[in-house]
Amino acid sequence: MGNFGLFVRFTLREGAGEAFDALVRETAAGIRAHEPGTLVYACHEVEGAPNERVFFELYADHAAFEEHERQPHTRHFLTERDKYVEKTEVDRLQPYTGKYPTGAEK
């Protein structure tokens, strides 16, 4: 089975950006340190939309995503994010072509 990805859009509560971004930085540090199956975990501010954040996540496979979801830093993020987020939209992605990091299937 090939790679598995997510595109996630968060609409933040007014004034919550700084605290949300700090939570994300803490979570990303755990991902970098403990998740070899998480190939990309890219978090972005949206130009012209200060209360929007988008994440692109790419996993080696669905099992790597499930392992990501079990990690303490991810569980902490999922518990704490509701303090800062009004709305979350998630698209599950099945990559089929493009330029990917070393180790990712096409």
Description of each model-found segment:
Residues 26-39, 58-92:
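An amphipathic, aromatic/His-enriched active-site/gating alpha helix that lines ligand/cofactor pockets
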Residues 4-34, 38-43:
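N-terminal first-folded block
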Residues 15, 26, 50, 72, ...:
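Short alpha-helical
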Residues 3-11, 40-70:
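Short, well-ordered beta-strand segments in beta-rich or mixed alpha/beta enzyme
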Residues 2, 42-51, 77-106:
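Glycine-rich beta-strand-turn "strand-cap" elements at beta-sheet edges
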